[in-house]
């Protein structure tokens, strides 16, 4: 299978039938579910007298609504308690594996599936969550779906999809010290726009991509959706195989060798034809911070908020809206903007290497006066690994709060929220109005290392100036 793109190969391998109107019935190899988008789907199955078609291909966890301070049951929020209880009942009834609180395997769905070895090259992955594209880091084709589609996959293990075009995003050279995959993807979205990927899958390729760790590749693919793409992926290589080897659900013994041989064949061939290609130079990318109300409104930390005349006319109305909402002026330097809350975590940047990068900044320093800073590991496994390295102690000594795993302040579905006009430095993926729990709260997206720098200084600060320039 040397010719063609990985996307084409995986699509063809999972095609069940061509449907009227041009869509395809696609088999889903792995279905991930959680407590928010699954209750209505299970209820719809029961109404129709249906059962889960392939419970062995369905895996559940709880992440969105869980508190990160105390996870003792019952939760203080009765709605959150009912959502978790409903998930527990549904999984028990249908024979679905649930990685619940205290299991040692609970965490954000897009963190636990890779770390358990569930996500593998050549798979189709679906989940009722926008950032399912994360799993494309392994050479999988992964789609975020809505509740009605969660119902369809539970009932049939397949999904009606329209085939996408493929855009290759080729990145030359290497990222500089202090610059991470988060900066790269924010730069890509800034350059192409939040709608440029509509109708596309993004293939991330080139020397800079090959040099990324698996965890940074997950960050990259996680935010492909923020650029409008339906999914994003990286071709599987030795980095992929080394990450998967020995994980709980990965193939082992002779099956491992067969799997690796097949996985290698899935990578896009040298003669693969792409519908479009865009090139970037990693060496020119600086630590990047969003200044506005979409992930596409980003600038290098050494830049100023763009003036209207510098923008495409189509982008000026939302820029004007962003100036007012964020209380930032055209031409204002982003460095030096004061922050109130600093959040490190999420499915974008809540993995061990993210915490290591932030801890390298925090070590020997202290959170600035008046700043609330907290770290939320992406999973129980991440938390235990970080604690084994002493990272929790580093953060606590620096004045950060060390929390239990969950989605936390990425979104306003749990107790971790902004208040009033607070402004956060956040390692999450969305800076929409009200995203972090306050209707007037403001969000600046950046890498975990940059969040740590903001926490230490009380303002947006170029992490490269703190003499702790590291990448993983």
From Swiss-Prot:
Which keywords fit this entry according to its UniProt record?
Answer: 4Fe-4S, Amino-acid biosynthesis, Branched-chain amino acid biosynthesis, Iron, Iron-sulfur, Leucine biosynthesis, Lyase, Metal-binding
* InterPro entries per the UniProt record, alphabetical: 3-IsopropMal_deHydase_lsu, Acnase/IPM_dHydase_lsu_aba_1/3, Acoase/IPM_deHydtase_lsu_aba, Aconitase_4Fe-4S_BS, Aconitase_4Fe-4S_dom, IPM_dehydratase_rel_enz, IPMI_cat
Protein name per UniProt: 3-isopropylmalate dehydratase large subunit
Q: Which Gene3D superfamilies match?
A: Aconitase, domain 3
Relay the cofactor remark from the entry: Binds 1 [4Fe-4S] cluster per subunit.
Describe the function of this protein: Catalyzes the isomerization between 2-isopropylmalate and 3-isopropylmalate, via the formation of 2-isopropylmaleate.
Q: Which family does it belong to?
A: Belongs to the aconitase/IPM isomerase family. LeuC type 1 subfamily.
Does the keyword section mention Metal-binding? yes
Q: Which organism is it from?
A: Synechococcus sp. (strain WH7803)
User: What is known about its subunit structure?
Assistant: Heterodimer of LeuC and LeuD.
Q: In which pathway does it act?
A: Amino-acid biosynthesis; L-leucine biosynthesis; L-leucine from 3-methyl-2-oxobutanoate: step 2/4
List required co-factors: [4Fe-4S] cluster
Q: Which reaction does it catalyse?
A: (2R,3S)-3-isopropylmalate = (2S)-2-isopropylmalate
């Amino acid at each position: 299978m040397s010719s063609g793109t990985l996307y084409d190969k995986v699509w063809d391998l999972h095609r069940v039938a061509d449907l009227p109107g041009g869509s395809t019935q696609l088999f889903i190899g792995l279905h991930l579910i959680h407590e928010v988008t699954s209750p209505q789907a299970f209820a719809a199955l029961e109404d129709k007298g249906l059962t889960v078609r392939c419970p062995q291909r369905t895996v559940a966890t709880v992440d969105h609504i869980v508190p990160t301070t105390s996870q003792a049951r019952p939760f203080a929020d009765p709605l959150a308690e009912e959502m978790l209880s409903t998930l527990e009942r549904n999984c028990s009834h249908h024979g679905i594996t649930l990685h619940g609180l205290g299991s040692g395997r609970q965490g954000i769905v897009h963190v636990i599936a890779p770390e358990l070895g569930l996500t593998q090259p050549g798979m189709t992955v679906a989940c009722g969550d926008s950032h399912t594209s994360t799993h494309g880091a392994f050479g999988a084709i992964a789609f975020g779906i809505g509740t009605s589609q969660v119902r369809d996959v539970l009932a049939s293990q397949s999904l009606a999809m329209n085939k996408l075009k493929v855009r290759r995003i080729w990145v030359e050279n290497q990222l500089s010290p202090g610059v991470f995959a988060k900066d790269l993807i924010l730069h890509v979205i800034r350059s192409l726009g939040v709608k440029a990927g509509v109708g596309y899958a993004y293939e991330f390729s080139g020397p800079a991509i090959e040099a990324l760790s698996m965890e940074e590749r997950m960050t990259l693919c996680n935010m492909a959706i923020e650029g409008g793409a339906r999914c994003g992926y990286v071709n599987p290589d030795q980095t992929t195989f080394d990450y998967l080897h020995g994980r709980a659900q990965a193939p082992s013994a002779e099956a491992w060798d067969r799997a690796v041989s097949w996985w290698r064949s899935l990578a896009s061939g040298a003669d693969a034809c792409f519908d479009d290609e865009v090139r970037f130079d990693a060496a020119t990318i600086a630590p990047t911070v969003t200044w506005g109300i979409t992930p596409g409104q980003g600038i290098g930390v050494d830049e100023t908020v763009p003036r209207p005349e510098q923008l495409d006319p189509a982008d000026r109305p939302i820029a004007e809206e962003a100036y007012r909402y964020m209380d930032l002026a055209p031409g204002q330097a982003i460095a030096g903007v004061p922050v109130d809350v600093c959040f490190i975590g999420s499915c974008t940047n809540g993995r061990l290497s993210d915490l290591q990068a932030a801890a390298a900044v925090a070590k020997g320093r202290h959170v600035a006066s008046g700043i609330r800073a907290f770290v939320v590991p992406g999973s129980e496994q991440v938390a235990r690994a970080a604690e084994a390295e002493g990272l929790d102690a580093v953060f606590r000594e620096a004045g950060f709060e060390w929390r239990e795993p969950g989605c936390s302040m990425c979104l306003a579905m749990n107790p971790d929220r902004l208040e009033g006009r607070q402004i956060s430095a956040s390692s999450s993926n969305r800076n929409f109005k009200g995203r972090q729990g306050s209707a007037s709260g403001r969000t600046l997206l950046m890498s975990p290392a940059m969040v740590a720098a903001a926490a230490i200084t009380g303002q947006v600060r170029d992490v490269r100036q703190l003499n702790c320039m590291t990448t993983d």
